[in-house]
Amino acid sequence: MAAVATLAACGGGGGDDADSAPSSTVEAVASVETTPPPTTLPTTTTTEPPPLTVDDALTTGGLGEVRLGMTVGEAEVASGRLMDLPPGVEESPCYEVTARDLPGVSFVVVDGRIRVIDVRDPGFATSSGARIGMSADEIRALFGERIDETPIEGSSALTFVPSDANDPARVVFFSDGTSVTRMLSGTVPHVLSLDACAEAGVGE
């Protein structure tokens, strides 16, 4: 009887050890599976527009990334250039600013928004290739019936009119009788005058 008891005790002990071993293995596997994988944060890059240059085209919408209707601050961001403002000029309902290190281009601001872009630098051109120095005939040849010619203040204005008659945007080529001396992109009525602020009623 003593021998039987001893065998029983040995057998029981072996069973307990076998039952506990898988439990430890499962716990270890579970521990491995619940370990989160390392995470990689996405990299973000900020792309700034290139500075405004003569490679940017003048259109009925603006000049390069500078759009009609922008504030001066928005134009600085879009052009990649600071704007030079005379002291106290922002208190006026109409004033003119220039982009730093970009002579020959100015922006007329009416009631806080850019309404006219005045280009006198012959390096700039429209998206169709029109530029300062061209004759009136060359401008007419480029745009055909879209050009409306008007005598204005001792010169002539060759105005490009969009096909949509309700569109107030224009590009105006001012000629001294021989060749184009200025190109303006803007909205009527401001763009139709050599002095946009006078057209806006400032100083009257």
Show where each model-derived region lies.
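Extracellular mucin-like PTS domains
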Residues: 21-49
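N-terminal post-signal-peptidase region of extra-cytosolic proteins
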Residues: 59-61, 89-96, 122-126
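Glycine-centered tight-turn and secondary-structure capping sites
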Residues: 69, 127, 131-135
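Acidic/histidine-rich, surface-exposed loop or edge segments in extracytoplasmic proteins
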Residues: 51-61, 114-123
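A cross-family detector of function-defining hotspots
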Residues: 71-110, 136-181, 185-188, 203-204
